[in-house]
Amino acid sequence: MVWKWLGALVVFPLQMIYLVTKAAVGMVLPPKLRDLSRESVLITGGGRGIGRHLAREFAERGARKIVLWGRTEKCLKETTEEIRQMGTECHYFICDVGNREEVYQMAKAVREKVGDITILVNNAAVVHGKSLMDSDDDALLKSQHVNTLGQFWTTKAFLPRMLELQNGHIVCLNSVLALSAIPGAIDYCTSKASAFAFMESLTLGLLDCPGVSATTVLPFHTSTEMFQGMRVRFPNLFPPLKPETVARRTVDAVQQNQALLLLPWTMNILIILKSILPQAALEEIHRFSGTYTCMNTFKGRT
């Protein structure tokens, strides 16, 4: 028993060195990309914003079928028609992911009409942009139901079949606010932090599930209607991301089987700073960068 324990202690650091070296080499050499030609992709919140750009990106890269879920039929119709004109089979279903029964019902309808889903992109989200004391209780609940619990329901609906097929990918379009919250968006930050923990646990739980993996994307502020009006102190230094950039990098991560993606890459520094700086220093960074007051001009949509 002692020798086995000592052997494990010796092997473990060697494994770490190998894995770090492998990752470093992978950053230099072009990785092997996943072929999407046989994949059926379902995108929640797929009618507009990042969801629409994700549909375009998957279609351009040869996805076999694309399914869009959302609450606004007009937007879903527009995106569906655009994807069909690109030559890709596309369907849409009106579905509120915050409604568990509706998710399970629509998932059944998708399987009957379209077939098996092999890539699930949890993109749907809402934000109300208020402090805790200014927030309506129902609005707070809605954020948790859509942004967090909605991912529980969609994943439970589609993951079992992926495991049977030994082919699947769960994608979470999260936010860097999951790691660094700001005032004025307490509902959104809380729900995104919870969704991040959900994906972290799910990703580890899939380690011994061949052919099935997960990707979490944490982008900085993106120039969509959702956060319209949000302003940082130095917009030229911290410009918002373009939704097409987020979509492109997300599909890259799926094809490369990348578990975690922060956008832009400088957001990785945020993790380091939060682990080494005292709270007072972190608070001063929020004041200096303008994130402390960036939601004061918020006009976005829910």
UniProtKB/Swiss-Prot annotation:
Pfam families: adh_short. Disulfide bonds: none annotated. Keywords: Lipid metabolism, Membrane, NADP, Oxidoreductase, Transmembrane, Transmembrane helix. The chain crosses the membrane at residues 9-29, 170-190, 195-215, 258-278. One of its GO terms (molecular function) is all-trans-retinol dehydrogenase (NAD+) activity. GO terms for biological process: bone morphogenesis; cardiac septum morphogenesis; negative regulation of retinoic acid receptor signaling pathway; outflow tract morphogenesis; regulation of ossification; retinoid metabolic process; roof of mouth development. It is an enzyme of class 1 (oxidoreductase). It is a multi-pass membrane protein. It is found in: Membrane. Its EC number is 1.1.1.300. In the embryo, expressed in developing osteogenic and chondrogenic tissues of vertebra, rib, tooth and limb bud. It catalyses: all-trans-retinol + NADP(+) = all-trans-retinal + NADPH + H(+). Substrate binds at residue 175. CDD domains: 17beta-HSDXI-like_SDR_c (cd05339). The keyword Hydrolase does not apply. Its main location: membrane. InterPro entries: NAD(P)-bd_dom_sf, SDR_fam. Catalyzes the reduction of all-trans-retinal to all-trans-retinol in the presence of NADPH. Belongs to the short-chain dehydrogenases/reductases (SDR) family. This is Short-chain dehydrogenase/reductase 3.
